[in-house]
Amino acid sequence: MKILVTGAAGFIGSYVCKRLLSRGDEVVGLDNINSYYDVNLKYGRLGTLGIDKNTVDWYKFVQSNTSEQFRFVRINLEDKQAMRMLFANESFDKVVNLAAQAGVRYSIENPYAYVESNIDGFLNVLEGCRHYKVKHLVYASSSSVYGLNGKVPFSEKDSIAHPVSLYAATKKSNELMAHTYSHLYGIPSTGLRFFTVYGPWGRPDMSPFLFADAMLHGRPIKVFNNGDMLRDFTYIDDIIEGILRVIDHIPTSNQDWSAQNPDPSSSTAPYKIYNIGNSHPCLLYTSP
């Protein structure tokens, strides 16, 4: 099976590539290696996949020196022509879209980057899946879509009508766009809402790294809402196990779906939404 993994230099994407390769799939990894955080970390992850950073260049396919089944190419998702050529030339069986402009607070200062990558870029992925008959699109959503929803633990059946960041709004938009393409063109799609993923090679902007770095350097840990909060932390291996199982489980139409009592996580279209790493929140702090 030939699978495209976008965001292959990212935390989750690099692990997905390794697992797919370990089971014998052919994998094409894509990433733009932007500077949202230290690019050396991204090149380091690619190094674990056999990609020499000195060979990486825009639009150039690089063959892994550790696996004949893995190639990497540097492309921006929002580059419509490059994405069209990629899909046309490679004939992917399945797509795992993990590329996105990440970060909740960063979206406040850099809104256009989120629309370009997370909306325009995702549209290019959907169009590739549509025109080149991809059998299953798996894509990253986010727990951020729950926004002002105060009920915990979150459920896929909960409302996501009130996002509180542009990042969350783009992820909600991805779910709506995917459903539209599943409905109009019959493209099976599965969206995964991740909850604070941590582990080796993790992102330096995420709370586990920030907490540990502050403690190591004797700085106070920044907390919000007076520190009174719940948070789900999910180990990377558990996330990857969930993704791999979903890749092989292609969604079908839910024949029991009712327009009078709609389930937002499924549809009459081949469409599904899952929470990955949710339901056991950790109490971080209780105010006296």
Task: Please provide the spans of the model-predicted regions.
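Conserved small/polar residues in nucleotide/adenosyl-binding loops
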Residues: Y285-P288
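Active-site loop of short-chain dehydrogenase/reductase
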Residues: K133-L137, I187-P188, P220, N226, ...
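N-terminal Rossmann-like NAD(P)+-binding domain of SDR-like oxidoreductases, especially those catalyzing
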Residues: M1-V197, I247
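Glycine-rich "substrate-gating" loop/helix at the edge of Rossmann-like oxidoreductase active sites
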Residues: V164, F194-D205, N225-I236, N278-H280
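An acidic site on a long C-lobe helix of protein kinase domains
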Residues: N118, Y235-I239, L283
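Short-chain dehydrogenase/reductase
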Residues: S107, F195-T196, S258-A259, I273-N275
